């Protein structure tokens, strides 16, 4: 089910989606997982890796962040996973925003306004129905949508979307002001923001422009 939902989301966004062979809720930063991810990164040859920090709320998320860190230094090592050619560069690693403060708060190094992307995000979430129309309504609000029609379930998610006042905290607002000026930044309700990981390469001018439009 989750694989079908992921492919439907990928089709909407026009992206490639590859699912690694680890069960939902059971991922650990094991040697097997590290080498699988290392081979995958080498095959894709990404300029930038987006991931969550290793202090995220979900154990799978924490493990993923740790695995990316564990892979970073060894991506160029020819003796590690010698069946895949090593990278001759280190990708940029960016963490997306989270609200957690332990061991330290998220630091927004770059941000971009995302108010115009809300409808696309809504459509993506609708395609991940088992998450956004089944599990999260129950986990967050104890709302059971089982037995409801698809239209009723989407209407619930739409109401949640429209009631959302925004995701721009003080640190992200300050980042937006530095980049775009206060007049523009203070009108932004929703934004994407990223923290640069010290385990990856520094952000160059081309990527900075791609992320911010500046």
What are these regions (language model features)?
Residues 81-82, 103-104, 110-214:
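C-terminal accessory domains and tails appended to enzymatic cores
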Residues 75-89:
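Short mixed-charge
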Residues 24-26, 55-61, 101-103:
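Active-site environment of divalent metal-dependent phosphoester hydrolases
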Residues 33, 37-55, 59, 64:
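Proline-aspartate-enriched helix->loop->beta-strand connector
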Residues 1-44, 74, 195, 203, ...:
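Active-site rim/loop-helix segments in enzyme catalytic domains that contact anionic ligands
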Residues 87-103:
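A structural motif
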Residues 6, 17, 49, 68, ...:
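Divalent metal-coordination and catalytic microenvironments
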Residues 59-75:
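Short Gly/Thr/Asp-enriched flexible loops that form oxyanion-binding sites at enzyme active sites
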């Amino acid at each position: 089910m989750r694989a079908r939902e992921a492919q439907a989301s990928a089709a909407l966004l026009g992206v490639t989606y590859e699912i690694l062979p680890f069960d939902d809720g059971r991922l650990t930063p094991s040697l097997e997982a590290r080498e699988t991810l290392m081979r995958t990164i080498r095959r894709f040859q990404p300029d930038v890796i987006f991931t969550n920090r290793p202090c995220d709320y979900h154990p799978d998320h924490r493990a993923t962040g740790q695995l990316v860190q564990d892979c970073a230094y060894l991506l160029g090592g020819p003796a590690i996973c010698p069946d895949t050619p090593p990278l001759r560069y280190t990708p940029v690693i960016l963490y997306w925003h989270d609200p957690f403060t332990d061991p330290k708060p998220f630091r927004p190094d770059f941000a971009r306004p995302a108010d115009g992307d809300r409808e696309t995000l809504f459509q993506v979430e609708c395609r991940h129905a088992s998450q956004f129309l089944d599990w999260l309504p129950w986990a967050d609000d104890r709302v059971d949508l089982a037995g409801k029609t698809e239209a009723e379930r989407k209407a619930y998610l739409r109401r949640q979307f429209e009631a959302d006042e925004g995701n721009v905290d003080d640190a992200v607002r300050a980042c937006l002001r530095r980049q775009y000026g206060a007049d523009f930044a203070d009108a932004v309700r929703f934004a994407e923001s990223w923290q640069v990981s010290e385990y990856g390469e520094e952000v160059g001018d081309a990527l900075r422009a791609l992320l911010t439009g500046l």
